[in-house]
Curated annotation (Swiss-Prot):
Name assigned to this protein: GPI-anchored wall transfer protein 1
Record: glycosylation sites: 560
Chief site of localization: endoplasmic reticulum
Protein species of origin: Cryptococcus neoformans var. neoformans serotype D (strain B-3501A)
InterPro entries: PIGW/GWT1
GO BP terms in the entry: GPI anchor biosynthetic process; protein localization to plasma membrane
MF (Gene Ontology): glucosaminyl-phosphatidylinositol O-acyltransferase activity
Amino acid sequence: MGDYKLAKEAFVSGNPGASIWSINAVSLVALATYALWIALSPYIRHGLLNNYLICVLPLLLGVTIFSTSPLVFASFLSIISLFFIAKSQKRFNFPRSPEKPKGQWLDESDSDEEPAEPASAAGSAAVSPAKLLPSQVAFASGSLLSTDPTISPMSPSSSSSSGHEDPLGIMGVNRRRSPLEGVSLDVPSHIDSKVRISPVPSLRLKKSRATKVQGVEEKGRLPFLTVYRAHMMLMTVICILAVDFEVFPRWQGKCEDFGTSLMDVGVGSFVFSLGLVSTKSLSPPPPPPTPTSPALNSHIIPLTPSPLSFILISLRKSVPVLVLGFIRLIMVKGSDYPEHVTEYGVHWNFFFTLALVPVLAVGVRPLTQWLRWSVLGVIISLLHQLCLTYYLQPIIFSFGRSGIFLANKEGFSSLPGYLSIFLIGLSIGDHVLRLSLPPRRERVVSETIEEHEQSHFERKKLDLIMELIGYSLGWWALLGGWIWAGGEVSRRLANAPYVFWVAAYNTTFLLGYLLLTHIIPSSISSQTSPSILVPRLLDAMNKNGLAVFLAANLLTGLVNVSMETMYAPAWLSMGVLMLYSLAVSCVGWVLKGRSIKI
């Protein structure tokens, strides 16, 4: 066992990495996989097996067998997607004869004369519903769509029964008969109180759709954001075990000192994603209300907690992740498990980083009164880079590990870099959060509430696309300039170019998922609800990311102590990886099915 441990540690050490563009090419498989799901979703059952075969298995194949030709594999998946998208357009967009709804404006071919007044109310019941003029439609809409029909200002019956007297007698017997009396108003039942009322005739009356705004799930969740985070989790889960097999290319494993690889960007992406969804919880608290009387200012009791109390609250929330870190530490040290010390240190692991980064973000939050999250992240990264260049870098690359700080020098020294990534993720999250905010309640006469929300969402989505394009170009330009000036990327140090690379990578692929949901043909999006745009398996992994990540770590350890992974043939390696990924998928699936969220 001792010889195998040394061989295994040598197996995962000394990796020079690969080019950034080859890593982007491998990651394109994730976008192609999501496009495949969108194309196939109208034709399949959304059970666990189909979710796994479409959402997980292509990713596994993309980072292992097809990692040497990722563009070919992504193109193959894209061709299948385009075929089914074209098929869906023919299936759902067949021509239909236009059907004129009842109670709408008259066409030019219809008569402009008012309907004849029936002799009696009894006779009117047998008459077929009459077509209405524009003024009559506006009158009917105002009376039927009122939230309280008993107080309609234009309804004679409501006035007589309202309890108010009519001293002038204008609402009594001598009133002018309404042209709508005796006419059967067959107004469609779908018009309800959600339609906005206007004192002027509406230009058009549209059916109020019962479905949610396309592209927005319940509780403001966004499909593209859910899929992005779930795919990031999936690729991390796959790689942490696949790296132990020969079928996983060495250049995709973590680099030793400097370099770029798929697993290097995956670590930073995990932190970036955590910041992306922490925007609400880390937004600056609103200022306490100030009394209108200046005399009361001296008696104000501050209701806003102090920064220290916020830090303690955040630390308390991080306790479960810290506990997981200590559990992993005990298991690794107690089982003589092969470990790569230069990743984080002797005792440090990634759970400690995940637990401490949000606490540090709360500590620097008061600075957001003057600086944006992204600017603050860049400043911290540049200051960290200065410390690395002139003091810390020689110490980190040395062999000395005496004392608790030197033993875990990689973990401690990389915290400012991961904090910068987290803050940049918060900045992008601010922009994404605006997409789920409801529109202002404005007076609209030509569209329903649902249509108004849909148009608002589309405008905000286009704004977000343009913002992400700008941020992506900016981060890539910053990274390119730094590398051109001679800088090198180092995950071990979490230096400034590594921060810029993680920001550029994640902003670009978040933009890719958003574009996929934006360019979906209307024929598919009309038949595919927002809940179907997010595969159930990916939604389950997104909701229970911590449980899925913990299960993946436990299963990875179980596989490594059960077999000599580095000597396994390709067919056995792929079989184990498929069973492993299916087992992890089942964990998230079962938790979601039982409505358990960890």
